[in-house]
Amino acid sequence: MLLKVDVLVSGTVPAILAAKQATKTTPIVMVTNVDPVATGLVDSFARPGGNITGLTRLTKDLNGKRLELFKELVPGMSHVGVLWETEAVVASIGPIGVKEYEAAAREMKIGFQSLEVSGHNPDFEGAFQAAAKGRVNALITVRTAVLNRYAKQIAELATKNRLPSMHEGSEHVEAGGLVSYAASPHESFRRAAYYVDRILKKGAKPADLPVETPTKFELVINLKTAKQIGLTIPESVLYRADRVIK
């Protein structure tokens, strides 16, 4: 039995795509990590068109800023590896992220290596072996549902290989990763309530409500992990942390 709803709120790309396929009329408020224009969710940020609007936690140059912060946290970084899923629901997520990190690494004169895993049967052991062979001494993960699901395993392998790891979501740091720099998911969903209010109480149409990008980002650091891999976090970075896990 299908329930009639007045508005849908969705926080993952697979769910947003499923909702979009299911209805062209029910308003959908998204909270996503991808570029909603590049992935075809909306027509534009200013005029979404259709029945979808909301927020994206992805902003211009965010990955470059993330790498700069990572380099400040790990001054000895000379070769960064980017771990990504080749079969994400939105196929462009991995390649776009990898391209942005590679460009930032080139600008900073840091070596770069792409570390791909299959979404259906991810071989993380193989990816870390490739990283070791390529002399990678710092790791970044591209956030997807599959990599989130294996956050603990990725963190354990990074610690085992004494690799500092930067993540695009704090759930990886809570699972044992070293650091994350990203928009707060809690703030994003609180802001999503604004869209729901405009749609339900003010009669606004999703097509006319601009998609927002975040203005505040959270830096989360796991000091326990830093100690396990023998890394001393610079005071200048630690002081700016929004949350520290001990």
Locations of regions flagged by a protein language model:
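Short hydrophobic alpha-helices and adjacent helix-cap/hinge residues
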Residues: 1-246
